[in-house]
């Protein structure tokens, strides 16, 4: 099942033109230490890094921050550690203690003192460094039992319990959003929350980054065959039901780096068995659901986005998902629900993404609405440019076809 936020706001403009790394940079690690919003901690080469990461200032650049994690080098931490900390674990427990840039302790947004401190620092930092776009990592709610700031409770037998800091996390997210919009009315905020779409938090951002929950599965199987299902993907990774686009981080090479190092060299050389097919299966799901892939860890989508650009697909182009009964492009006959035909309205016709998520090749007959495409539209393979002789299309197992339809 999926959550539905109502009312839904429109998706941000130009989101189909987002090209991570070339038209937008969603991730800019700008600090010497982790998540302390203070210009004094900018890296020594910050001006040069900012120029490079933003293509000389020509594309939006999202400065990296976080939620519940922050460096113990935060100037206010030594004095307020006991009040600000999430407990358990004990206050002062560090993650990655030997890596200065990424070492952190656990901070609780349930602490009003911490929220006020963070917001004051963030307001000043955004203004001083002109941060028009922000990226927040580690920003879902946590359970906390720290009574020093009001979390936790004790039952009649004296047993202590944690409480979820949802309201404090919402308050911090809301106030950051308001202050950011006050300074930069047309700026954007991205939150990276994999598979925890908390409406109280994601209501205060413009896009979601997801996909980090499947590292071991993908590393073991070298594919998303056992992860993706049409209904699961539709409910989890489209973002439309939350009023914001979702960007999926593929885990191929990242999984190999962290858990299966013996596979990394072959992956980078493109020599893993079935590697190209596994990549196309992943990309097919992205395209068939009108969502976004983070082009990293072995995945490139540039070729397919160029095809969409050449077809004239923009933010204003209608999208017809395979699940929508009013789509002008349907599959004829009774087929597996793992065979999907989605369509984007394009110049003088449509671009169809025909996805076959089964283990067998599929011969699919497309049923086209004559009121939209006329009685004898021209069909071609958008990747090869070859003309099709009719509306019957063969799709390899665990693969997709991009079919261009021209109205006649």
Predicted regions located by residue number:
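Carbohydrate-recognition beta-sandwich/jelly-roll modules
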Residues: 1-68, 133, 286, 296-307, ...
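Short, acidic/polar
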Residues: 7-16, 114-127, 279
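Conserved beta-strand positions
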Residues: 23-27, 136, 145, 191, ...
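The substrate-binding groove and active-site-proximal loops of carbohydrate-active enzymes
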Residues: 24-43, 99-119, 155-169, 270
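Active-site-adjacent "subsite" loops/lids of carbohydrate-active enzymes
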Residues: 47-129
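Active-site groove signature of glycoside hydrolases
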Residues: 118-152
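Active-site-proximal substrate-binding groove within the catalytic cores of carbohydrate-active enzymes
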Residues: 165-374, 378, 383
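C-terminal beta-strand-rich structural cap/linker in extracellular carbohydrate-active enzymes
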Residues: 389-408
């Amino acid at each position: 099942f999926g959550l539905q936020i109502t009312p839904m706001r429109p998706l941000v403009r130009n989101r189909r033109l987002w090209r991570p790394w070339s038209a937008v940079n969603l991730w800019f690690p700008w600090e010497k230490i982790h998540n302390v919003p203070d210009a004094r901690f900018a890296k020594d080469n910050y001006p040069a890094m900012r120029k490079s990461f933003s293509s000389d200032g020509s594309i939006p650049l999202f400065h990296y921050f976080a939620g519940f994690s922050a460096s113990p080098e935060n100037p206010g931490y030594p004095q307020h550690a006991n009040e600000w900390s999430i407990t358990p674990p004990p206050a002062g427990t560090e993650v990655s203690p030997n890596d200065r840039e990424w070492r952190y302790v656990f901070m609780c947004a349930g602490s009003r003192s911490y929220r006020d401190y963070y917001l004051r620092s963030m307001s000043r930092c955004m203004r001083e460094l002109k941060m028009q776009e922000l990226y927040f990592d580690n920003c879902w709610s946590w359970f906390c039992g720290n009574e020093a700031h009001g979390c936790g409770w004790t039952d009649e037998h004296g047993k202590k319990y944690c409480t979820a800091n949802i309201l404090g996390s919402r308050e911090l997210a809301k106030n950051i959003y308001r202050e950011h919009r006050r300074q930069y009315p047309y700026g954007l905020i991205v939150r990276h929350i994999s598979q925890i779409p908390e409406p109280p938090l994601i209501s205060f951002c413009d896009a979601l980054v997801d996909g980090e929950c499947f590292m071991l599965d993908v590393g073991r199987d070298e594919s998303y065959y056992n992860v993706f299902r049409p209904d699961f993907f539709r409910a989890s990774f489209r973002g439309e039901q939350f009023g914001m686009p979702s960007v999926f981080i593929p885990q191929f090479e990242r999984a190999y780096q962290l858990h299966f190092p013996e596979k990394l060299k072959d992956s980078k050389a493109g020599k893993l068995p079935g590697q190209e097919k596994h990549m196309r299966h992943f990309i097919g799901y992205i395209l068939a659901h009108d969502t976004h892939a983070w082009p990293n860890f072995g995945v490139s989508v540039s070729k397919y986005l160029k095809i969409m650009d050449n077809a004239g697909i923009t933010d204003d182009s209608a999208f017809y998902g395979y699940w929508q009964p009013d789509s002008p492009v349907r599959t004829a006959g009774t087929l597996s629900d793992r065979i999907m035909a989605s369509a984007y309205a394009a110049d003088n016709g449509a671009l169809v993404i025909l996805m076959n998520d089964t283990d067998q090749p599929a011969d699919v007959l497309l049923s086209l609405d004559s009121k939209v495409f006329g009685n004898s539209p021209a069909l071609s393979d958008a990747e090869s440019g070859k003309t099709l002789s009719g509306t019957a299309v063969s799709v390899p197992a665990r693969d997709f076809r991009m079919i261009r339809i021209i109205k006649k």
